[in-house]
Amino acid sequence: MRIVLVGPPGAGKGTQAAFLAKNLGIPHISTGDLFRANISQQTELGKLAKSYMDEGNLVPDEVTIAMAKDRMEQPDAVNGFLLDGFPRNVKQAEALDEMLKSEGMKLDAVLDLEVPEDEVVKRIAGRRICRNDSAHVFHVSYKPPKQEGVCDVCGGELYQRDDDSEETVRRRLEVYHTQTEPIIDYYRAQGLVVTISALGPVEEVTQRAMDALKREDASK
């Protein structure tokens, strides 16, 4: 299957993408990973992207599209892929359609992970990170430390990142709605959008997504 994954920050896209890709036997293609790989390998596209990023500018659509195209042409993506973070706008969505059409292919589904806005804020704003090791992550509601403000693993101080403040999260949600809702509308007009609730345990959400994708696949 060829799938695009969308959902607000805090919806668990990265986690679900990894599980779904494994269950479906297709590669998980994340734009974040693509940028990091191209920059670390110093590819021409990576150098170009880095030049924009170093100046604090957004990487142009053309560069992102070229990176995605290059990755989707790899042998492991011949029979399908799960895109996470691409397309980010309608221009990129149109480019993806053209890309696939030129190869005689098309998308099978756009999986929309739905989470109420207040839950997104709760999920992200409740995160606490250890100052000694950022891999030690806690949550005031879902995974509280034994002692408030202290890491269970190493005793380091737990803090809230600036990016995780409620004000920042709500701003990120505004950007998401502005950028992504037009993409969802674009794909909905093609009958590709499959919306599921991303509330509940990770395994339940994965199963919900798998069931929805199977139904979508069977209906074609």
UniProtKB/Swiss-Prot annotation:
What's the Enzyme Commission number for this chain? 2.7.4.3
Q: Detail which positions bind ATP.
A: 10-15, 127, 137-138, 200
Q: Molecular function (GO) terms listed? A: adenylate kinase activity; ATP binding
Q: Name one Pfam family in it.
A: ADK_lid
Domain of life where this protein originates: Bacteria
Q: In which pathway does it act?
A: Purine metabolism; AMP biosynthesis via salvage pathway; AMP from ADP: step 1/1
Q: Which cysteines are joined by disulfide bonds?
A: none
Q: Where is this region: NMP?
A: 30-59
Secretion signal span: none
Q: Which GO terms describe its biological process?
A: AMP salvage
Q: Where is AMP annotated to bind?
A: 31, 36, 57-59, 85-88, 92, 161, 172
One term under GO cellular component: cytoplasm
Identify the stretch(es) annotated as LID. Answer: 126-164
Q: Write out the similarity annotation.
A: Belongs to the adenylate kinase family.
* Free-text note regarding domains: Consists of three domains, a large central CORE domain and two small peripheral domains, NMPbind and LID, which undergo movements during catalysis. The LID domain closes over the site of phosphoryl transfer upon ATP binding. Assembling and dissambling the active center during each catalytic cycle provides an effective means to prevent ATP hydrolysis.
Protein task: Catalyzes the reversible transfer of the terminal phosphate group between ATP and AMP. Plays an important role in cellular energy homeostasis and in adenine nucleotide metabolism.
Q: What is this protein called?
A: Adenylate kinase
- What species is given as this protein's source? Streptomyces avermitilis (strain ATCC 31267 / DSM 46492 / JCM 5070 / NBRC 14893 / NCIMB 12804 / NRRL 8165 / MA-4680)
**Gene behind the chain:** adk
